Amino acid sequence: MNQVRRWQRILILSLLLLSVLAPIVFVSNRLKSITSVDRGEFIEELSDITDKTEDELRLTAIEQDEEGLKEPKRILQDRDFNSVVLSNSSDKSNDTVQSNEGDQKNFLSEVDKGNNHKPKEEQAVSQKTTVSSNAEVKISARDIQLNHKTEFRPPSSKSEKNTRVQLERATDERVKEIRDKIIQAKAYLNLALPGNNSQIVKELRVRTKELERATGDTTKDKYLPKSSPNRLKAMEVALYKVSRAFHNCPAIATKLQAMTYKTEEQARAQKKQAAYLMQLAARTTPKGLHCLSMRLTTEYFTLDHEKRQLLQQSYNDPDLYHYVVFSDNVLASSVVVNSTISSSKEPDKIVFHVVTDSLNYPAISMWFLLNPSGRASIQILNIDEMNVLPLYHAELLMKQNSSDPRIISALNHARFYLPDIFPGLNKIVLFDHDVVVQRDLTRLWSLDMTGKVVGAVETCLEGDPSYRSMDSFINFSDAWVSQKFDPKACTWAFGMNLFDLEEWRRQELTSVYLKYFDLGVKGHLWKAGGLPVGWLTFFGQTFPLEKRWNVGGLGHESGLRASDIEQAAVIHYDGIMKPWLDIGIDKYKRYWNIHVPYHHPHLQRCNIHD
């Protein structure tokens, strides 16, 4: 019994040993039987697998390193990956890739030399192995670039790039072509067709309406309906038929000239109408501002008399910084005051004088009562209650050759009475109400004006956004004007001006202003407004300030650079496109809007928004 069991164990162990040794012997014999050609076929299959999976490996590597990629680098590579040219900001990475490519080329040359002494079958195997090694070297080069945060892009031919650029640029060519055909068709319809061609005219009208419905207000080709190409072809056929119906070319040329003249006249009329509407919008008070003024005026008269006055301050202290603005606009005067105070390094030394008329005095007073300025002092003055203007001044203003209420306003010319309005002051800075202060103006008070009366930024350089010449405002054909003044003299701008009131009083320039103003009204020697008569009154009395103190041109399309605006101490919205009007220029409005409290309840109720 024990003998039987022993034989069973021996048999089982023998079978186990045979099952282990048999595969080893079989595989070794199989490997020995593989010929060189079979080995070449095997390597070729392996190389094909490597080539097929190369792009997949590259994409997988990019996905794994995607979070580290911040900016794509430019790459130019061949389709068969025989060469790789990489644009990288790192010289070190470039040297690494180039050295790898050089080693690779040397390796390939050595292999080629060795293959010359081998049989053809072995050379085939070597070539396949070389291609596989080439692919491996390229993959290693890509790994290096991926480590340097370089993104690989699939190669694109030159024709593909040109096509892509053309598609990006020509996004409205089809729309323009359709509109040209419509214009051409309408021109033919306006011409008298010879003979009996009613069918052609009918077809042309139908095609025109079809294209007009297809295009509508479309400006891009991608928004055109799919039927537009067919309709365009039908229009071209109709235009060809119509063109063959005309034989009298001189008559057609005459008709087209008449149509051109009519179109030009219509364009000129449209321009005149647009200019008139712009001027009308500039002179009209916006509904929101009118609502705000009415609400503030009503609230002002509901207050007790003793509560209507601002706290009395040192309004006549000559050691403080005095600023003045003449305005009938609540928001405009508020922006001037707020921007000046917020930009100042010493707001407690600022005294702001806001001069207005009787109509707007309650509203402006109520606004500053509701919105105190903090440490700065504010004084609201009514020009109609001050006995500084001559009794006949209003009559002189009405004689100006202008219907613009802004020009004939008493506030516009009250600036020429500054020494009389502020008899206790020696210096003062005058603002127009369409300015915004962006820098501290303390340095102005320490300027030595060398005996001049007014400090201003000059505007006599051609190409300057605020360029003006004397002869464009003043009639130098008059003998008296040409003898006393120089037409080539440098002009200067209002907006922000520093006045030496002591020197003004000494030279009695207010009397000079009244004399010149009366002469100008009687003889029509210059354009209406305060600027021409101001140039003549202060002729030879101007101290030039640096340009950065006052940058103008924000009230019209002047092409100002953003850097010039942001570096300016004061920006001036000279022109009709004021920032509080709907016609204001959006890119310039933002400098004004930041000083307007649009969250204020009164502005919300009057629908005044940013």
Swiss-Prot record:
Renumbered residue ranges of the record's region Disordered: 86-170
Tissue specificity as recorded in UniProt: Expressed in roots, inflorescences, siliques, leaves and stems.
Residues spanning the membrane: 7-27
GO molecular function: polygalacturonate 4-alpha-galacturonosyltransferase activity
Compositional bias ranges of the Basic and acidic residues kind: 110-123, 139-170
A matching Pfam family: Glyco_transf_8
Disruption-associated phenotype: No changes in the cell wall content.
UniProt topological domain (Lumenal) ranges: 28-610
GO cellular component term, pick one: Golgi apparatus
Glycosylated position list: 88, 94, 196, 338, 401, 475
Topology relative to the membrane: Single-pass type II membrane protein
Keywords, ordered alphabetically: Cell wall biogenesis/degradation, Glycoprotein, Glycosyltransferase, Golgi apparatus, Membrane, Signal-anchor, Transferase, Transmembrane, Transmembrane helix
Location of this chain's protein in the cell: Golgi apparatus membrane
Biased amino acid composition, Polar residues: 86-101, 124-135
GO-annotated biological processes: cell wall organization; pectin biosynthetic process
Its EC number(s): 2.4.1.-
Pathway involvement of the protein, from the record: Glycan metabolism; pectin biosynthesis
Cytoplasmic side: 1-6
Function: May be involved in pectin and/or xylans biosynthesis in cell walls.
The family this protein is said to belong to: Belongs to the glycosyltransferase 8 family.
PANTHER family: GALACTURONOSYLTRANSFERASE 4-RELATED (PTHR32116), GALACTURONOSYLTRANSFERASE 5-RELATED (PTHR32116:SF66)
Name of the protein: Probable galacturonosyltransferase 5
Organism: Arabidopsis thaliana
Upper classification of the organism: Eukaryota, Viridiplantae, Streptophyta, Embryophyta, Tracheophyta
